[in-house]
Curated annotation (Swiss-Prot):
Gene source species: Nitrobacter hamburgensis (strain DSM 10229 / NCIMB 13809 / X14)
EC class: transferase
Similarity annotation: Belongs to the RNA methyltransferase TrmD family.
InterPro entries per UniProt: Alpha/beta_knot_MTases, tRNA_m1G_MeTrfase_C_sf, tRNA_m1G_MeTrfase_TrmD, tRNA_m1G_MTases_N, tRNA_MeTrfase_TRMD/TRM10
Keywords: Cytoplasm, Methyltransferase, S-adenosyl-L-methionine, Transferase, tRNA processing
Chain residues that bind S-adenosyl-L-methionine: I132, G133, D134, Y135, V136, L137
Subcellular location: Cytoplasm
Job description of the protein: Specifically methylates guanosine-37 in various tRNAs.
One Pfam family named in its UniProt record: tRNA_m1G_MT
Cellular component annotations (GO), alphabetically ordered: cytosol
Domain of life, source organism: Bacteria
Any one biological process term the GO annotation gives: tRNA N1-guanine methylation
Subunit structure: Homodimer.
Name of this chain's protein: tRNA (guanine-N(1)-)-methyltransferase
């Protein structure tokens, strides 16, 4: 079973949204497991102190290396599990990483707070820093939920159809094509005729063209990478 362990100072935040919809139903069905642990339980003093002032001065507080290391050691049960630290300075999370994580045993995720985490525990416990975007939140809990939700929906049996995630944004390097449903007319805007034609080949070609156009317009970085791997087909005969 895919299992994720979350280390946090606010365990009451979980499962939160992960207890609803696809992830929630899958959790109840036993398709994945969530282990949430309070970092404060690893504090040594009676005040359950987990942070201290930054060496060299500066604002805020820093999560202590000794406390977090103890929490990681107490929670870890497999050396093969990825150890992640949700951090705005981490490498951007991508769909390919999500696919890889969902295919493994499930990660241990550290949710940071304060000004950050003592660098020594990041190095000593091999924490891979992961970011969900170029912005700063109050803590790592919401990013951790986003990562877990993205992984869980790819687990076997979670989505209704195996192909449900096949054409989603990023699955093939492109953003997803526009979607439509009834009514056929909405405020003078019709569903494109091609989608009602019943010609599956033409529908597929339309969707591919729309996905390419959207990606090129909205995510030139993705488009450049995709176009480099998918050069235009030559019309000349060999």
């Amino acid at each position: 079973m895919w299992r994720t362990t979350v280390l946090t100072l606010f365990p009451e935040m979980f499962p939160g949204p992960l207890g609803l919809s696809l992830a929630g139903r899958a959790l109840v069905a036993g398709l994945w497991a969530l282990d949430v642990r309070d970092i404060r339980c690893s504090a040594a003093d009676r005040h359950r102190s987990v942070d201290d002032t930054p060496a060299g001065g500066g604002p805020g507080m820093v999560l202590r290396a000794d406390v977090l290391a103890k929490a990681i050691d107490a929670a870890e049960f497999s050396p093969d599990r990825p150890r992640l630290l949700m951090s705005p300075r981490g490498r951007p999370l991508t769909q390919s990483q999500i696919v890889e994580l969902s295919a493994g045993p499930g990660p241990l995720i550290v949710c940071a707070r304060f000004e950050g985490v003592d660098q020594r525990v990041i190095e000593a416990r091999g924490l891979a820093e992961v970011s969900i975007g170029d912005y700063v939140l109050s803590g790592g809990e919401i990013p951790a939920m986003a990562l877990i939700d993205a992984c869980v929906r790819l687990l076997p049996g979670v989505m209704g159809k195996a192909e449900s995630g096949a054409d989603e944004s990023f699955s093939h390097g492109l953003l997803e094509y526009p979607q439509y449903t009834r009514p056929q007319q909405f405020e003078g805007r019709p569903i494109p005729d091609i989608l009602l034609s019943g010609d599956h080949a033409k529908v597929a070609a339309w969707r591919r063209a729309e996905a390419e156009a959207l990606t090129k317009a909205r995510r030139p970085d993705l488009w450049t990478a995709w176009a480099g791997q998918n050069p235009p087909k030559s019309n000349t005969d060999g």
